[in-house]
A protein has these predicted regions:
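C-terminal alpha-helix
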Residues: 60, 64, 247-250, 289-297
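C-terminal helical subdomain
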Residues: 224-271, 281
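Glycine/proline-rich active-site loop of Rossmann-fold NAD(P)-dependent oxidoreductases
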Residues: 188-191, 208-212, 250-255
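C-terminal amphipathic/interface module of NAD(P)-dependent oxidoreductases
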Residues: 274-298
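Rossmann-fold NAD(P)H-dependent dehydrogenase/reductase core
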Residues: 1-206, 296
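Alpha-helical membrane-targeting segments
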Residues: 153-165, 202-239
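Short, flexible, mixed-charge acidic loops at enzyme active sites
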Residues: 135-140, 211-220, 262-265
Length: 298
């Protein structure tokens, strides 16, 4: 029996991936959700804006696992905020927590339950890379303290939507750095765990822009097919979900030294992330400072 723990499996590419997982014999899916989950999945309550809820989710997963181990940990949830003013109950900027810090905490707390040869996948975005030239402003840094408390950042963008976009891209940069750091942890190395950053690319038809202005949200969700025909770089929700499902099911073997899996024109490719994402010093400082924010040792 293959056991998969997943966040972000109720809509968009995650919903497609979860259906694929649930259709696979001898596979068990534990799904973090704020509401109703997928039929056939074991739903465990999870609100990523609350770190206490993240810890409760881990307790629920551990209770359901019993003596079993996790064969795939798929952290796919994420969303874009309308501005940079949102704060979580812990006092941190919302986009930073939902798109990165909560998943960092999940990584730290669930890593001991990973099976030998397990797969860990964190969903990220090409917005982290200035060379991708996306619609969102690229990150300036991966300073966890400033991203958690952007009011302290002397270079914070004055325009709310620009600040929100940069918060999102910075959180996705942090995700890739965390993937690189996790792969170096002794318990992960000892278990021969595959750790990947998964970028589904721009994918109309998903709920990523649920917090955006109504016109943009409707266009993104409802007119996905038309947008894909107009902009060739856009991917389909079905392709993005199928690749994510294949990763979760252990059907993707990354080339040696590759960890950044990116969907481009519906095909899975292996790319180098941005220069900042490859900076070892930035990686190590982020891992340490993220631990401090969630009350753990590095």
């Amino acid at each position: 029996m293959r056991t998969i723990v997943m966040t972000g499996g109720t809509s968009g590419i995650g919903e497609v991936a979860a259906r694929q997982i649930l259709a696979t014999p001898d596979t068990r899916l534990l799904l973090g959700t704020r509401g109703r989950g997928q039929d056939g999945a074991e739903s465990v309550r999870l609100d990523l804006t609350r770190l206490a809820d993240v810890r409760s989710f881990v307790e629920g997963v551990n209770d359901r696992l019993g003596t079993s181990e996790i064969d795939a940990l798929v952290l796919n949830a994420g969303e874009n905020q309308p501005n940079g003013d949102g704060r979580t109950p812990d006092g941190f900027e919302t986009s930073f927590v939902v798109n990165y810090l909560a998943h960092y905490l999940l990584l730290r707390l669930l890593s001991p339950r990973l099976a030998d040869g397990a797969v860990v996948s964190l969903t990220t975005s090409g917005t982290h890379d200035p060379e991708e030239d996306t619609m969102l402003p690229p990150p300036r840094h991966a300073d966890a303290a400033l991203l958690a408390h952007p009011d302290r950042d002397p270079d914070r963008d004055a325009e709310p939507r620009v600040a929100a976009g940069r918060a999102y891209s910075a959180a996705n940069l942090c995700t890739i750095l965390a993937v690189r750091a996790l792969a170096l942890q002794p318990e992960v190395v000892a278990k021969n765990v595959t750790v990947l950053a998964y970028d589904p690319g721009p994918t109309p038809g998903t709920g990523l822009l649920r917090n955006a202005p109504a016109v943009a949200n409707v266009a993104w969700r409802v007119f996905g097919g038309l947008l894909r025909r107009m902009v060739r770089r856009y991917n389909s929700k079905e392709a993005g979900g199928a690749h994510l499902g294949a990763i979760a099911l252990g059907r993707v073997n990354p080339p040696a030294g590759r960890y950044y899996a990116a969907v481009r024109r519906d095909a899975l490719t292996w790319l180098e992330p941005s220069k900042l994402a490859r900076d070892d010093r930035v990686r190590d400082v982020l891992w340490r400072d993220s631990a401090s924010l969630v009350g753990l040792q590095p």
